[in-house]
């Protein structure tokens, strides 16, 4: 049995978590000053949220963690970036109808890409956008 994190991932240990909390708090404070609202979307979405018509980008073709639900035609993908999920939420919840436009939103959280790990590049990483 293998008791190590998968290649390209890492644990954030108690000795380091305060730094992460502080960074996230600074991001939230900065965004609050400029009237941005935080949005949180699911860690996985329907695969078509990330696929665009005729998209041949590496991220779509090679770097997404996609899985098929058992006994179903449903395909889900771990989010490789945050923007597509935010756009999906904006449309799904008709946010254009009850908010002043343009809306100013931000997200911060883990993203997952199946890319070759290298120095400074992990398969699970945090992104602010």
Language-model features, listed with the residues they occupy:
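TRNA-recognition modules of translation machinery and tRNA-sensing kinases, especially anticodon-binding
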Residues: 1-129
């Amino acid at each position: 049995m293998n008791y190590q994190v998968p290649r390209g991932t890492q644990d954030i240990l108690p000795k380091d978590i305060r730094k992460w909390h502080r960074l996230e708090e600074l991001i939230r404070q900065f965004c609050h000053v400029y009237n941005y609202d935080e949005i949180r979307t699911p860690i996985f979405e329907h695969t078509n949220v990330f696929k665009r018509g005729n998209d041949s980008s590496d991220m779509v073709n090679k770097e997404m963690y996609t899985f098929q639900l058992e006994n179903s035609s449903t395909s889900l993908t771990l989010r490789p970036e945050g923007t597509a999920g935010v756009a999906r939420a904006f449309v799904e919840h008709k946010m254009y109808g009850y908010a002043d436009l343009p809306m100013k939103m931000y997200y911060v959280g883990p993203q997952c890409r199946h890319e070759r790990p290298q120095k400074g590049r992990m398969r699970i990483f945090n992104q602010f956008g």
